[in-house]
């Protein structure tokens, strides 16, 4: 398959699935060659899907029922609060959330970093995650604990210091096999391919793949692109006005501790730019999970959860597991 990639020929879903498993037993040099050849050629939906399905199949198994995930690829280089973590806690007030996350690679506040800064403990085992889900409607699945098969591949990826397919696989490889997912990507071109890949991996009833003017989130200060999947595909653009919100600035964030403090400020009812950023993305997640009928409804549901104290109470439940 390496020669095929060098000739810039695309792999099928089945070939991509096979290649992932081949890489688990290859030398570091050949792993690097495959990853660079694949990236140089350009990734297709079938290749992303084949790798993602193989990554899920090699993951530590966990069954949490019908869950939603809120996760982004990262890699946008932005210094923002961790919106997906805030959204996941709001969402857990209404439905089961399996948040697949990791430590930061390119940002100042990866989801695992912020989760810990919020005073929450990362479940050590699948049984611990199930206990958390049963008690709180929420489980944090720390990626490093669920993908031991990548132990040989990740040092090569890190040493290469260039983008590879693994930069976008994390959100597609949630071992809980989410039924609903809002997934942020770091380039507009990825929206359609990642949505198609999600549909091919299987198990998804509804998903939104979003890109927000340089962010792997919906942006509160401009136009965002969404590719929606619910058995069919639909691509469209939105602005804060579609959510009944004003445009607002994105305030830089310098650390996980700062991100956690600012999330708690919003959960406590503080009205500021962060609130709009979080409400917009929470509304999209509530719509994705079929809790809200549309984005406007999602904003109202999220506002009520914050203003009534439900979200702060949910955070306290998660802290106390």
From Swiss-Prot:
InterPro entries for this protein: Anthranilate_Pribosyl_Tfrase, Glycosyl_Trfase_fam3, Glycosyl_Trfase_fam3_N_dom, Glycosyl_Trfase_fam3_N_dom_sf, Nuc_phospho_transferase
Gene Ontology cellular-component terms listed: cytosol
Keyword Glycosyltransferase: yes
Cofactor requirements of the protein: Mg(2+)
Protein residues bound to Mg(2+) 1: 84, 217
The UniProt record lists the keyword Magnesium: yes
Amino-acid positions noted as binding anthranilate 2 in the UniProt annotation, renumbered to this chain: 157
Residues at which Mg(2+) 2 binds: 216-217
Cofactor: how bound: Binds 2 magnesium ions per monomer.
Annotated disulfide bonds: none
Domain of life, per lineage: Archaea
Catalytic activity: N-(5-phospho-beta-D-ribosyl)anthranilate + diphosphate = 5-phospho-alpha-D-ribose 1-diphosphate + anthranilate
Keywords from the named record: Amino-acid biosynthesis, Aromatic amino acid biosynthesis, Glycosyltransferase, Magnesium, Metal-binding, Transferase, Tryptophan biosynthesis
Stated role: Catalyzes the transfer of the phosphoribosyl group of 5-phosphorylribose-1-pyrophosphate (PRPP) to anthranilate to yield N-(5'-phosphoribosyl)-anthranilate (PRA).
Quaternary context: Homodimer.
Protein name, entry field: Anthranilate phosphoribosyltransferase
């Amino acid at each position: 398959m390496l020669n095929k990639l060098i000739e810039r020929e695309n792999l099928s879903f089945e070939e991509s699935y096979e290649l992932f498993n081949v890489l688990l037993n290859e030398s570091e040099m050949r792993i690097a060659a495959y990853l660079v050849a694949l990236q140089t050629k350009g990734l297709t939906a079938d290749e992303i899907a084949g790798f993602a399905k193989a990554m899920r199949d090699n993951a530590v198994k966990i069954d949490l029922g019908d869950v939603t995930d809120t996760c982004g690829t990262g890699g946008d280089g932005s210094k923002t609060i961790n919106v997906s973590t805030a959204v996941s806690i709001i969402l857990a007030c209404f439905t089961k959330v399996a948040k697949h996350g990791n430590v930061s690679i390119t940002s100042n506040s990866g989801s695992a970093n912020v989760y810990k800064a919020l005073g929450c403990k990362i479940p050590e085992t699948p049984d611990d995650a199930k206990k958390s889900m049963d008690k709180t409607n929420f489980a944090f699945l720390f990626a490093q604990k669920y993908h031991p098969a990548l132990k040989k591949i990740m040092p090569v990826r890190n040493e290469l210091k260039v983008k590879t397919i693994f930069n976008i696989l994390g959100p597609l490889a949630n071992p809980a096999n989410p039924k609903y997912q809002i997934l942020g990507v770091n380039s507009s071109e990825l929206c359609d391919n990642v949505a198609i890949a999600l549909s091919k991996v299987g198990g998804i009833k509804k998903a939104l793949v979003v890109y927000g003017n340089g962010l792997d989130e919906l942006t509160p200060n401009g136009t965002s692109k969404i590719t929606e999947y619910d058995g069919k595909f639909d691509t469209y653009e939105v602005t804060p006005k579609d959510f009944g919100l004003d445009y607002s600035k994105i305030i830089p964030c310098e650390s996980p501790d700062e991100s956690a403090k600012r999330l708690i400020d919003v959960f406590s009812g503080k009205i500021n730019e962060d609130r709009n950023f979080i409400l917009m993305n929470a509304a999209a997640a509530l719509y994705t999970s079929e809790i809200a009928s549309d984005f406007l409804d999602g904003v109202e549901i999220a506002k009520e959860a914050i203003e009534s104290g439900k979200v702060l109470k949910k955070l306290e439940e998660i802290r106390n597991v």
